[in-house]
């Protein structure tokens, strides 16, 4: 073992605050997504529905409406405005954000597209965790859980992390298929156990 959570083994002293012991606070600082004048999607988000540090946001979209383009614009905006400390950037920001793209049940082409976008935008500093649509449901849920745990470890180290998850619906379906049934069914065919 050479590194633990990205740190050399020698520097790991075992002293860290557990994620569960951290305080949750209301967002008080905005994440600016706007970059250039020709990219309007992130500017509209900043004006109409700003996203703050510590906030959760949801993009609801019908198929073929441009959700993937919006996700890529959000990733690019965060990478430009809040580059990681070791990443070279022209923007001098007090904060840096580590980007994690988590893709559940995606087509392989979409995974490649997002992977390239994250690498290009972050200088290969961001992470992509993905499961393809043809993988078993248990593997799809495992990818999401591992990514969440990785993000928690980074937050415990004092980093700001943004998880871009595509898609919550496919994640819920994977849990619905992977978990044993309770015998009850909610609207949409979901088992209540899959939602908790």
Predicted segments, located by residue:
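Short beta-strands and strand-coil junctions in structured, solvent-facing domains, enriched
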Residues: 7-10, 65, 170
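Residue-level marker of positions within ordered structural domains that often coincide
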Residues: 6, 59, 152
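Short loop/turn motifs enriched for small/polar and acidic residues
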Residues: 4, 104, 168
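Phosphate-binding glycine-rich loops and their immediate beta-loop-alpha structural context
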Residues: 21-86, 92-144
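Interdomain "pre-motor" coupling segment immediately N-terminal to P-loop NTPase/helicase cores
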Residues: 1-18
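Conserved P-loop NTPase nucleotide-binding/switch module
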Residues: 111, 118-123, 127-129, 137-196
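Active-site phosphate-binding and catalytic loops of NTP-dependent enzymes
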Residues: 9-14, 31-33, 40, 156
